[in-house]
Amino acid sequence: MMLLTLLILSSVGLAAAADPSLFSENDYSPDNIVNRDVLIVGGGAAGTHAAVRLKDLGKSFTLVEKSSVLGGHTHTYIDPTTGTPVEFGVHSFGNTSDTRDFFARFEIPLVDFVPARFPVHYIDFNTGDAVAVALDTNVTGYLDQVEKYPSLAYGWLTSFPVPSDLLLSFGDFVNKYSLQKIVYTIYYLGVGIGNILQQLTITVMNSVGVGILSGLQGVPGGAVVPAAGNNHAIFDKALAELRADILLNSHVVAASRPANNSGVKVVVQTPNSRKLVLAKRIIVAVLTQPENMNVFSPDEREARLFSQLKGQAFYVGLVTNTGLPVNQSYYNAASSEPDNVPLLPKTYNIQSTVLPGVFWWLYGSETALTEAAVKTAVTSQIATVRRALNVPAPAGSPQFLAFGNHTPTHVTVPAEAIASGFYRDLYGLQGYRNTWYTGAQFIDSASGIWNLTNAVVLPGLLTGL
């Protein structure tokens, strides 16, 4: 029986409990012991917003972020010559009260998002064939289906059992509702999902929802951006204000999370020292895959859920010296597929930006790749596009100005797990062992995450704090 139990726990990735001696206050100097109401793990859109809200609510916190900046998937390149900001991560934010309030908090005015329009060439990035994509932007039929599930706008699967349509592969869903004409449109709106026809319909709808579709249909005000440009400015301002309570280039080493509401102890490695954070609550604002959560010594209930999450590899960046004609964009389209949707691995598109000659690219893979491997693949497909257009190669190789790694993205679980109540159980972890959760595994948009934090996470976390 003991062997069977060990095998079961191993299969769900249950981590061993941390050495209790790690949490002894006697082993830390006074300046390396931090007492706070809340420890926040992750400084992306979710964690940064939670930190600002806690400060405004009069609660103390420490935020731990593994990189040197806040902002997560929001990347802005500033041209060194002109000072022009170029977005190569998050391009816009849903126009919700949560978004408007967050930007207003830092006195950043917003305007409607108007995407740049450049002539588009549809090319098979593998063969170099020009592809006649019959792009249909009339997504009314799909929108009618999405609107049946309003809770998906915030990642909340409040109905149970889960409707069977949501558990169909998107390919089967398309066939059921005769949506073949708009497959390529949904594909390019949902870049990063991966092989879209093989994904579950619920995954696609969670990414390509009412907000994105409203913008496509010409509804003004569906998305907003800072009036001065630079989507990353809000995170820069947040860092400047909260710097004393943020540990950058740092990571959690171990955590003690008793189930009796007696508070938590978390060991954090910073560039200069190891700190012991004593807190009443934890907000986990990173993906709860085992590689992130094993340091928190998940129990069987938690590990069973965390071990099931899988995501796609996704990379973004800016490149110049491509030899491609400027002020035009190039979309990958499979010449051999009836819906023209290419399979992974692939460069999704190579798009012009506001800087002439600088292109924004997006690359996806089913497995994680090194930065060098991604750049090699993108360079190869740039050459294929150039040959398709019959334009000469430039002197030298493409120059990569910026690179962002969004791996893993669009994390999800199999249909069987969802049907068995996976998301019900995942939401059921809110508050368990003094730990609360927010972030992209619930909803893949900043505005949706901020709503989740404001409406669900903070009210529960603040009770009794």
Swiss-Prot record:
GO terms for cellular component: plasma membrane; side of membrane. Keywords: Cell membrane, FAD, Flavoprotein, Glycoprotein, GPI-anchor, Lipoprotein, Membrane, Oxidoreductase, Pigment, Signal. It is found in: Cell membrane. This is FAD-dependent oxidoreductase pigF. The lineage of its organism: Eukaryota, Fungi, Dikarya, Ascomycota, Pezizomycotina. Glycans are attached at residues 95, 138, 260, 327, 451. The gene is pigF. Its cofactor is FAD. Pfam families: NAD_binding_8. Its EC number is 1.21.-.-. FAD-dependent oxidoreductase; part of the gene cluster that mediates the biosynthesis of azaphilone pigments (MonAzPs), a complex mixture of compounds with a common azaphilone skeleton very widely used as food colorants. Within the pathway, pigF desaturates C6(7) to afford the orange and red pigments from yellow pigments. The first step of the pathway is performed by the nrPKS pigA that forms the hexaketide precursor from successive condensations of five malonyl-CoA units, with a simple acetyl-CoA starter unit. As colorants, MonAzPs are widely used in various food products for centuries. Moreover, MonAzPs also possess wide-ranging biological activities such as antibacterial activity, preventing hypertension, lowering cholesterol levels, causing hypolipidemic effects, and displaying antiobesity and antitumor activities. It comes from Monascus ruber.
